[in-house]
Amino acid sequence: MRAWLLGVGLSLLAPLLAAQVSLPHDEYLPADPFGQRQDKPEQVLFEVQRYSLTVGSELRPGGRPNQAEAGVWLLLEGRSLLAGSPVERARLHFVEGGAGLRAARLEDDANTLVITYPLSLLPVIRQQLDAPGADYVQRRFYGNGLIWADLHSAPQSGAR
């Protein structure tokens, strides 16, 4: 009888144990149709309080004048919403087309999150940051190698 109860209990618990882990700001992630987000990820989450835009170019020593590189970056700074998380900055790097998109990563002794976006998204992101309401940066690294990063805004009430 005891073994039967244990078996029934485990069969009832199994779906709950396999369910997706709930974390702050889950509602901003897209659906997970392939079930890749099952474990509890390392999460970075902070509210953006200010930002700055940098447009720069660089010619490396010994390079020819036509080999200069240019770039656009937004530096977002704010306040962490997770206890113990030192990450309160994100550098959004914009690249032409989709070339050179890299997974979100931590730099500068793990205090700055770097996210790469296509340059075509810069106007949309600037508009989002300039709109009223709170904005947040989020990154999640799952044990299976899945990496999610985003910039999202708090829900807004629509003007009618």
Regions from the PLM with identified roles:
Residues 1-3:
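Positively charged n-region of N-terminal signal peptides that target proteins for export
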Residues 158-160:
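Short, solvent-exposed mixed-charge patches
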Residues 13-16:
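N-terminal signal peptide c-region/cleavage motif recognized by signal peptidases
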